[in-house]
Amino acid sequence: MFCDQDDIWFDNKVEYMYCAIRCTDENMPSVLYTNAYVWCPLIGITGTATLTFPKDINSLLFLNSGIQGCASIFNASMRELMLKWDGALAMHDHLLHLLGCTVGKIYYENLPLMLYRNHEHNVTGNTRTNKNDIRTICSAMGHPVVCKKHYDAVDKFRRIYDDFLEDDMKYIIDEYLDLPNRSLFQKIVCIVTNRFRCYDSVSRILVKLFLKPYIK
């Protein structure tokens, strides 16, 4: 379990999550996520932090992130896998989520168990609380479809965990990694064919392709 210094945990968070992860197969690398309330000190609760719950790699890669590490708990088998990583990484929660979607197993409990403090100093930035808000797509036009930092982390992940990945996982990751080399039309075909999604939406990625730079 990771903890961030500026969040406020409910009294039952640790006990609830510990009991939940104990019910999973200890031999299978597993991670369990709960939700959180987004909390602004000057406003109060503005919504929930986690708006999508990806369980496969196709729905994770274009998020350019993972669910907050402070909302997770993982077993010893997952810990051993994470320790195989060598060198810098985009974010620890990104690695954890990649492993859960490929090598291990992910569990979700859509239950808020903490206040996720939203302010300008958050490492992951200010959290939007409406995934269907058109502003989340059209705002910050300079932001790319794919964050280079996370792209590089996926590339490194593919190499480090090659022996643990099934062939179908390798194929999907390789398709994602090759996208910067393809034309706009080829990108569209690849995204649709492989069912890449962002917030459970293929079309969301396609819209971004026309509005934003692909990677930087």
Question: Language-model features: where?
Answer:
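C-terminal subregions of glycosyltransferases and related glycan-biosynthesis enzymes
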Residues: L89, R117-K216
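Nucleotide-sugar donor-binding/catalytic module of glycosyltransferases
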Residues: M1-T129, L206-I215
